[in-house]
Amino acid sequence: MMTEVHDAGRPRVVIFNGSQLQREAIIPFASRSSCFHHQLCSRGHLLIIFLLLVSPFNDAAVDVDGDDNDNLIIDHVPDAKSSSEALLNFKSSLSTSSPRGHEVLGSWIPSNSPCSGNNGNWLGVLCYEGDVWGLQLENLDLSGVIDIDSLLPLHFLRTLSFMNNSFKGQCLIGISLEPSSHCTCPIIASPVRSRMMLPGYDLSQEALFGKQPIQRQHPHLPGYLLPQVFELSLENNRFTGSIPHFPPNVLKVLNLSNNQLEGPIPPALSLMDPTTFSGNKGLCGKPLESACNSPSQEANNPDSRNSSTISGQSSTDVIRKSPTRLSKVMLIVAVCLVVLCLLIVLILIIRRRSHSSSQNPQPVESNYSNNDRDQNAFTSSAPDDHVTLSGNSTYSNNQHSNSNKAEAPTAAVVGKLSFVRDDRPRFDLQDLLRASAEVLGSGNLGSSYKALLMDGQAVVVKRFKQMNHVAKEDFHEHMRRLGRLTHPNLLPLVAYYYRKEEKLLVYDYASNGSLASHLHGNQSRLDWSSRLKIVKGVAKALAYLHNELPSLALPHGHLKSSNVLLDKYLNPVLMDYTLVPLVNLAQVQHLLVAYKAPEYAQQGRITRKTDVWSLGILILETLTGKFPTNYLALSTGYGTELATWVDTIIRDNESAFDKEMNTTKDSQGQIRKLFDIGVACCQEDLDTRWDLKEVVQSIQSLNDKDHGHSNSDQMHDAGV
């Protein structure tokens, strides 16, 4: 998919994804910044301004070389005619056999300008301020020759994505890469010149892989490419030749497996995992077990010699820089250091204020907050509970929680995701780490994030740290068990990631937030019919868990309003279910709400009726709109506050009902019946507390009105 990196309001990265190199090769992109599309983020804007001021690659920055003035952007008026002609020439080199491809290319007509401001009039054309800055031609079954020459008039072209088409052969990238760019296909010679270059870069004549050795056809061009590429994923292609010499400690992720490479592995890569080079019969040397036969193998390797030559020439270029450039660089570095020091001081002040305010939390935090929209990478940490993400809404498990602030998974996480469902699109851990992420909340068990993958799929990622005592095989088996659970009112587990220190669970995404956010936050209030519908769905899901998991004393164990999510039709789905066997025994009584039940506080026991008690609390909370006192505090036992809360609800009777339900006289009797069911579920005596089967049957018999029962309701209840 397409991703942009912005500076000074204009997209910068110029890449396209490989189409079909014996296998689809997808170029990973940097995470997106909401500050480009929205107003500057509340805490991130200072850093953005800092980067714009000091970045030597800024479009309006001073030309450090002093001899490449063509790359400076001073003023510009979009040339619609030139853009149209360039795109039509490019279109003429393409062909497609798919209806969608004909639809997209058919919208490219001379009578209509490609861009109107920031809107693209031609399908697949991305625009900014009237300029064509990107082409997104994906999944169109395109074939033919990628005619880069025809795109030369597009002076502000920054992004090309030709993913999932039928192009064959080598993948052209005629535009240089930023230091944060990724590359997943070979960079070969291209006639594109400085008109499509980012300032200070021209790598159009460089080559990375292929039978021809790397050649310097323009000796004055700096060899900046290899030191900037920190991730290469070239597996499952047919690349030939040898591996060039990379500077040490530059490549963070490398995968060259299943190609036709040969020769010795460069020493700088000798500490990589052997699987990085597997499937290349001609490779030898560490970390592979096959040793090179003789030193002559390396001497006979023309690619190695040429890559070394390029490295040497690059060093010579740097040494020959003029004193004028050196002084400019030193000035920029000095400014960077000063601004960085000021930024650090400002961050410390903000963190101290945040820490002070956290000592006096508000009575109830909204489950939907606009404070969590700071943009950053899903892989980076952020101050306080601000973790990157894009999107328009968030939900949280953070009511009255004294747990640690949300922390984003870091890029140090390595390994593969394990999928438990066959009907979901596949993605890997690196896709999650690159995804736009949005913090959803931080609860007792861990942190939640919404991740928007490059293909547009949205998932919820739950990060747990209180599960590091469970054995690996036991964890895998429990995940497989959860993957087999299928119910319309359960949030499906899609995949998981295991590491001893922490675990990641990946779920489907529910778009309408949590029940708690509608009851206590700034979401729209729920009427009586919606609340009854939600309680019915929760009861069905709880009954399903009890039927499918008869060996567990607590099939759910963590039922609360913030763990009841709602889809766009207000259908409820439960999350954080069946986690009791995974949580460390030392923390389970502090973390899970089921251990607030009276039988655990009084007798130290947990039964299958404990989930019924949690359901009763949920019913009373739903009818009254009142948050259970001390319900989420990290303490053991039932607690006098929660006992008093239940007694107060019972004593207030009908006067405690939430006025936001907009009830009528016709529904008063049904509301009273549901209230009585909730009270029966909250009985402290286990013998008098209803069992789940009786509770579910009573709830499903309710209607939104006292008299009459619609056919649709009868059919709906019959499917219980």
Swiss-Prot record:
Its EC number is 2.7.10.1, 2.7.11.1. It is found in: Microsome membrane; Cytoplasm. The chain crosses the membrane at residues 330-350. One of its GO terms (molecular function) is protein serine kinase activity. Residues 288-319, 356-409 are annotated as: Disordered. InterPro entries: Kinase-like_dom_sf, Leu-rich_rpt, LRR_dom_sf, LRR_N_plant-typ, PRK1-6/SRF4-like, Prot_kinase_dom, Ser-Thr/Tyr_kinase_cat_dom. The keyword Endoplasmic reticulum applies. Gene3D superfamilies: Phosphorylase Kinase, domain 1, Ribonuclease Inhibitor, Transferase(Phosphotransferase) domain 1. Coiled coil: none annotated. Expressed in mature pollen grains and pollen tubes, but not in style, petal, leaf, root or sepal. Very low expression in the ovary. LRR repeats lie at residues 40-64, 123-146, 154-179, 226-248, 249-273. Autophosphorylated. Residues 434-702 form the Protein kinase domain. Keywords: ATP-binding, Cytoplasm, Endoplasmic reticulum, Kinase, Leucine-rich repeat, Membrane, Microsome, Nucleotide-binding, Phosphoprotein, Receptor, Repeat, Transferase, Transmembrane, Transmembrane helix. GO terms for cellular component: endoplasmic reticulum; intracellular membrane-bounded organelle; membrane; pollen tube. It is an enzyme of class 2 (transferase). ATP binds at L440, G441, S442, G443, N444, L445, G446, S447, S448, K462. Residues 291-317, 356-382, 389-405 have a biased composition (Polar residues). Belongs to the protein kinase superfamily. Interacts with KIP1. This is Pollen receptor-like kinase 1. It comes from Petunia integrifolia (Violet-flowered petunia).
